[in-house]
């Protein structure tokens, strides 16, 4: 039976992990075992935080809309209810951008709703 040499396969696998761990501090970028643990943790955190980022932006948009709407005596939930009642389809992101950047058109929108 012939000898199977697969040293480069294992080396390539380890180098791939060490390449992902570049920039980590201390032994986390030098030693394979700690680098592997740190990259797994970093990748899971990045996945989790990509999901959390969406939630955080929705919170920011809602608070911006709520602050802009309260100047006219409404609150966020009644504003959304009136938008739905008048069949105006604007998502939270666009509403918050209008409220932040173009107050005149936002007041026109509020006048149309109220």
Swiss-Prot record:
- Write out the GO MF terms: rRNA binding; structural constituent of ribosome
Q: What does this protein do?
A: Binds directly to 23S ribosomal RNA and is necessary for the in vitro assembly process of the 50S ribosomal subunit. It is not involved in the protein synthesizing functions of that subunit.
What the entry lists under NCBIfam families is as follows:
rplT_bact
Write out the entry's keywords from A to Z.
Answer: Plastid, Ribonucleoprotein, Ribosomal protein, RNA-binding, rRNA-binding
Location in the cell reads: Plastid
> Which Gene3D superfamilies does its entry note?
6.10.160.10, Ribosomal protein L20
Can you cite an annotated GO cellular component?
ribosome
Q: What is this protein called?
A: Large ribosomal subunit protein bL20c
Q: Name one GO biological process term.
A: translation
InterPro entries attached here? Ribosomal_bL20, RIBOSOMAL_L20_CS, Ribosomal_protein_bL20_C
Query: What is the first-listed, main subcellular location in coarse terms?
Result: plastid
Q: Which family does it belong to?
A: Belongs to the bacterial ribosomal protein bL20 family.
Q: Is Ribonucleoprotein one of the keywords?
A: yes
Record keyword Transmembrane helix present: no
């Amino acid at each position: 039976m012939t000898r199977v040499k697969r040293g480069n396969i294992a080396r390539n696998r380890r180098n791939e992990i060490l390449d992902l761990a570049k920039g980590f501090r201390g032994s986390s970028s030098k030693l394979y075992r700690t680098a592997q643990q740190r990259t797994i943790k970093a990748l899971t955190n990045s996945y989790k935080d990509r999901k959390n980022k969406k939630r955080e932006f929705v919170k920011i948009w809602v608070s911006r809309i709520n602050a802009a709407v309260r100047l006219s005596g409404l609150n966020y939930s009644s504003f959304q209810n009136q938008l739905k009642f008048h069949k105006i389809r604007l998502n939270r992101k666009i509403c918050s951008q209008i409220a932040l950047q173009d107050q005149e058109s936002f007041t026109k929108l509020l006048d149309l709703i109220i």
